[in-house]
Amino acid sequence: MALIMTQQNNPLHGITLQKLLTELVEHYGWEELSYMVNINCFKKDPSIKSSLKFLRKTDWARERVENIYLKLQRHKERNQ
């Protein structure tokens, strides 16, 4: 029961890392993302595939990207 309640309050529940990253790239672009999160997979020959591979292995980087996504979603909600 606690897990269900936790997931209901999780704004990222049901959103894949690929969807999240794709939306960020469409909104900010790779160059801007590389300034926001200083990782090579955003700087040198960036691709969704290589970035997903890195983010799935690297918790701190994934958390930063998820936080950027959440801020973007809050900004979109305020402007509607």
Curated annotation (Swiss-Prot):
Keyword DNA-binding belongs to the record: yes
Record InterPro entries: DNA-binding_VF530-like, SAP_dom_sf
Keywords from the named record: DNA-binding
Domain of life (superkingdom): Bacteria
GO molecular function: double-stranded DNA binding
Keyword Signal: no
Pfam family, one: VF530
Purpose of the protein: Binds double-stranded DNA (dsDNA).
Quaternary structure, from the entry: Monomer.
Protein's name in the database: DNA-binding protein VF_0530
